[in-house]
Structure formats: C-alpha cells, structure tokens
Amino acid sequence: KNDGRVMADFMNNTVDGTDIVMKSAGDAQRAFCYITDAVRAMMIVLLNGDKCDSYNVANEDEPMKIREVAQILSDIAGNKIKVIYKQENDTGGYCKYVRVGLDTTKIRTLGWNPKIKLLDGLKRTYNSFIAE
C-alpha cells in the first residue's frame, strides 16, 4: 500500500473503493506490461538472450496516459470511485518526461511480444484482489 508507484496506488484505491487523487494532469504516458508478459520475457531472455546483454520489456503496442489508466480503473470499479485532479506544486518525485519510450525491438527478435492487453490485465488484477 502507498508505495508511490502509480499502478499500485491506483489499484489499491480501486480495490479499497477510495477515489483516485491525481497529483498531476496525468499527461505522462507509460507502456505498462502485465506480469505474465514480463515473466515470459525474462524466460525468453534467460533461454535465448545474449549473455550480459540487456533487453527492454514494455507493452509499446499500448502506451497510455496516466489519467486514462485512472479512468479505466474507475470504470472497472463500476464508477463507484471518482478520479479527482489535485495538482501539487511539489512533483519532485515524478519523472519530468511525458513519454518514456522503450525500444523493445531487440527482445521481439527473440520471439517475445506482449499478449495481455492493458484493459484485460487491469481487470484480471482487480478481480484477483476482490476475490481475496
């Protein structure tokens, strides 16, 4: 809880039924990757990757703005929670880049590509928390 990362914090809000409070306009765009896609990527690199090389893992097929993720989570929760914009002057902990693009070409040449769409991953995660 409250680990400061947008996905974990927003998901906790959604599961707890508390409003998502945006600390910025939410214009930053990220390429979230579902855990099974990330694990598959690690296994592919472990088995087929070049020794001592690095590979970017991200779902570059679906870059999404932070505010869009917040709205999707509100929708998943049946609109029981609201997305509230309360910009703070001190955004020192946030990345200043609107878009951080990761080139996934190298890992894709090994045969990896993301399989889980962001919406499906968010629904799966939400449902797994609700089922607990």
Protein language model features and the residues they cover:
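Flexible, glycine-rich beta-alpha linker
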Residues: 1-7, 29
